[in-house]
Each structure stands twice: as structure tokens, then as C-alpha cells.
Amino acid sequence: MKIANTFIKRGAAGGLDLSQAPGVTLTLAERRRSRQRLDLDEGRGELGMAIERGQTLRDGDVLVAEDGTYVVVRAALEDVARVTAATPWQLARAAYHLGNRHVLLEIAERHLQFEYDAVLIDMLAQLGGVTATRLRAVFEPDVGAYGGGHRHGHDESFGDDYALAQAAYHAHEAHPHAHSHAGGHGHVHSGHGHGGKHGEHDAES
């Protein structure tokens, strides 16, 4: 199994040829994890991810495997609440109250989005002038100022790191002389009989 230990932000990926690149569709929770095993879209194989901690992948970012293979990140549709208001002041007031509850919040010019929560919907209904609509949408909250979560040492993720390393080792040993690594490859190998679920993930707070 190939490992991606870096990625290119979507704003810097415009010059890349991604026409044949596989994709991987991830929820926000998955895009915030630095260590995991991914099932690529359309059954195009697996990829181990081991990027720098504290990063949040966004729709259109490009993971780069150790052999130079590109994998395009696609944000999954999620169950969110979209908040609109009659005036900018009322929208700002809604953002203030949601922020007081430490909610991950996506802030756009004319609306807010957060992970759907019926309790928060009821709270917003009491503000007046605010409408919250439940829908399925890409969710990309502003997490840049806070990083990817709070960590206390390496113990939380050691098991995941070790399992990922073991999976990569055994995948390589199963095909020790199948190809040369000198020139690199422009594709990701197909799956090796694993199930359709993602592997174990880091614990994020």
C-alpha cells in the first residue's frame, strides 16, 4: 500500500494534470485526521495517509503519495444546518451564540453552516429573524485558527501509526519483485481484498 505524507492545497494545484488521478471522498471528521487508511473512489485501491498533524484537508486538495501519485480529495456531503437571517446583524448575532457553544462553524457572506443539531436549531429559533434549514452539503468550517485538534503526546495515535506501517510493509512484501521503484508510477494499485470501510483513525478532540 502506498503512503501519502504530504498534500498540495487546492489553490496551488491548478497547474497539475489531474485528469487521470483517483479521488477519495471524505467527511470533515476524516479530513481532520492525519493518520488513516483510505479506500479510493470507484474501487481504485487503497492509500495510507500520514500527513503532518494539525492539518485539515479541504475539497480539491491533492494528496501526494511517496512515488509521486496524486489523489484528489473530495469533500463528502454531510447533514448540516444552513442559517440565514433578515439582516447582517442578525446573522452575526447567530454566529456569536453558536461560537459561545464552541460549534465548528462555516461562515459565508450570506449564511452560516454547522453540523446539524436539533438543540441548536431550537436555540436559533428563539433569536428572531433567523432561519435554519437542514440539508446535505459540503461542510468546510473555519478551523485554521485552532488547528486540527488538541493533542497530548503521541500515545493517542501510536497504535494507528504502527498499524499503518505494518499494512504498508506487508503489502510490499507480498510483491517484492513485481516492479522497479526507480522510475515511479503514475497510478495507485487496485485493492487487495480489504473491506469497504476506512481504517482506524486518530482520536480528535
Curated annotation (Swiss-Prot):
InterPro entries: UreE (IPR012406), UreE_C_dom (IPR007864), UreE_N (IPR004029), UreE_N_sf (IPR036118). It holds the Pfam family UreE_C. One of its GO terms (cellular component) is cytoplasm. Residues 177-196 have a biased composition (Basic residues). GO terms for molecular function: nickel cation binding; unfolded protein binding. Keywords: Chaperone, Cytoplasm, Nickel, Nickel insertion. Involved in urease metallocenter assembly. Binds nickel. Probably functions as a nickel donor during metallocenter assembly. Belongs to the UreE family. This is Urease accessory protein UreE. The gene is ureE.
